[in-house]
Design a protein with these regions (language model features):
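SAM cofactor-binding core of SAM-dependent methyltransferases
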Residues: 1-21
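S-adenosyl-L-methionine
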Residues: 16-69
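Short alpha-helix
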Residues: 36-48, 132-149
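A short acidic, Gly/Pro-enriched loop at the edge of an enzyme's catalytic core
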Residues: 64-80
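A short glycine-rich, Lys/Arg-flanked "PGG" loop and its adjoining helix->strand segment in the class I
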Residues: 73-74, 94-109
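Acceptor-substrate binding/catalytic loop of class I
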Residues: 91, 121-142
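Conserved beta-strand signature within the Rossmann-like core of class I S-adenosyl-L-methionine
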Residues: 110-118
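Core SAM-dependent methyltransferase catalytic element
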Residues: 148-185
Length: 185
């Protein structure tokens, strides 16, 4: 497991070690269990997830070797998941494209990428700080994936209804892209 920000890696570590004060993800694991419909408890789902996480590593998607040199992560990976990262840490569309190119190096030919992100978001609040985000639309995401050597298997968007907007950002929707790295790339 990786994260761009040290503060996020620390928080993930608290959750992984089940330490007091860790963020409570149970509402999300309950939702996953409900969707899967296997009758599994959310506590069991979280236990299984914790057992699968071996390490929490820093990643810098702006570097050609995002995990740094000499990383202990087994590479190339069969699958990658990136959620709300690339657009949030990229100042412009060209940086978004480079970041996608960089994480693509971590994936084997024929491997799968699940890319989740915000649509047309230009800022979000982190405490008192207003942070810039590169606003991307569905077509820009499709084009970036193609330029990085992916075949888009599925890309769906969800428009954020006005009543769900909380004022902490200006997001218009969310995209969910499943893409496969072309063989030979």
């Amino acid at each position: 497991m990786t994260d761009f920000l040290e503060v996020n890696r620390q928080e993930l570590g608290l959750w992984l070690r089940e330490e007091p004060g860790a963020f409570d993800w149970s509402v999300y694991s309950q939702h996953v269990c409900l969707i899967e419909g296997k009758g599994e408890s959310c506590q069991e789902k979280e236990r299984q997830l914790r057992a699968r996480v071996k390490r929490i590593l820093p990643i810098d998607v702006h570097q050609p070797q995002p995990l740094g040199t000499g990383s202990l992560a087994p590479l190339p990976a069969d699958a990658l998941v990136s959620a709300f990262c690339l657009e949030a840490v990229s100042p412009d569309l060209a940086s978004f494209q480079r970041a996608l190119d960089h994480i693509t190096t971590l994936l084997r030919s024929g491997g799968h990428l699940l890319l989740i992100g915000a649509l047309e978001e230009s800022w979000y609040l982190a405490g008192e700080a207003r942070l810039a985000v590169v606003p991307v639309c569905e077509e820009e995401v499709r084009e970036a994936l193609a330029r990085s050597g992916y075949e888009v298997r599925d890309l769906r968007t969800y428009v954020m209804p006005a009543h769900l907007r909380t004022g902490v950002d200006d997001v218009k929707g969310i995209f969910f892209a499943w893409a496969q790295k072309k063989v030979g790339v």
